[in-house]
Amino acid sequence: MALSFFFLAISLGSPTAIGDVSFDLSTATKKSYSSFITQLRDALPTQGTVCGIPLLPSTASGSQWFRFFNLTNYNDETVTVAVNVTNVYIVAYRADAVSYFFEDTPAEAFKLIFAGTKTVKLPYSGNYDKLQSVVGKQRDMIELGIPALSSAITNMVYYDYQSTAAALLVLIQCTAEAARYKYIEQQVSSHISSNFYPNQAVISLENKWGALSKQIQIANRTGHGQFENPVELYNPDGTRFSVTNTSAGVVKGNIKLLLYYKASVGSEYDIPTTILHPGAMGMLHNQNGNYVTM
């Protein structure tokens, strides 16, 4: 991908400048939100596809490390969010002249993102478990939807220890997780003017993105389409089911981005690693890619 950043103005329907993907919640429709998520996916670099699903790069560095998107809420408040291209992990955001970084953000990122702003290190990481402990609620008890995202932006602009942590839980799921999964995108796009509590299907997909990505790549490598280990997910009604092969619906029509998986040295499932700028500063190797420890 030749350009480091993209600006796709959803409200205008066409690119207006190099910089970011943008979405104005005040004019949101089901179609415009889905277009925003699609263009966010498209702005991420990939190293080919596996089973027809874009595979994210194994590593990235320098200006290639991040993509950015802007969100403007009902109150005309705007935040700019930085996303790690290797795992769609949100690492920082800017509100006016202040930028906020998760406490576990690599030091090199501070030199690359939001230059010229006042930098604040948040007193928590972007891990779901940590954010939920700060908020005092599990994700299934925190509302999602466009109205919830609008309120979240306000709570990101006006920092508060607990309220901002809750806001980040909403942000992550309504953007990064929606980019990873069509089902989560559809859940949010069905709630343009109302909120909803995420069901167990949403939560289990969020928790198992790394596991699904790994098993899809292993199954593709063997040529048989069978997972080495089944991945346990939940239906919306809370019943459990196992995904065991690449013919499953979650593989063929739901997961939209794959976290790169590199097998152990000497494994028959080993997949070659692509490094965008070897030896450059700011190199980051993704790990499990999930916002929650499983």
From Swiss-Prot:
Protein keywords: Glycoprotein, Hydrolase, Plant defense, Protein synthesis inhibitor, Signal, Toxin
EC number: 3.2.2.22
Propeptide position ranges: 265-294
Catalytic activity: Endohydrolysis of the N-glycosidic bond at one specific adenosine on the 28S rRNA
GO molecular function, a single term: toxin activity
Name of the top EC class for this enzyme: hydrolase
Carbohydrate-modified residues: 70, 220
InterPro entries, alphabetized: Ribosome-inact_prot_sf, Ribosome_inactivat_1/2, Ribosome_inactivat_prot, Ribosome_inactivat_prot_sub1, Ribosome_inactivat_prot_sub2
Biological process (GO), any one: defense response
Catalytic residues identified in the record: 177, 180
Gene3D superfamilies: Ricin (A subunit), domain 1 (3.40.420.10), Ricin (A Subunit), domain 2 (4.10.470.10)
Signal sequence, start to end: 1-19
Protein function: Inhibits protein synthesis by depurinating 28S rRNA in ribosomes.
Similarity remark: Belongs to the ribosome-inactivating protein family. Type 1 RIP subfamily.
The protein's name in its UniProt record: Type I ribosome-inactivating protein trichoanguina
Phylogenetic lineage: Eukaryota, Viridiplantae, Streptophyta, Embryophyta, Tracheophyta
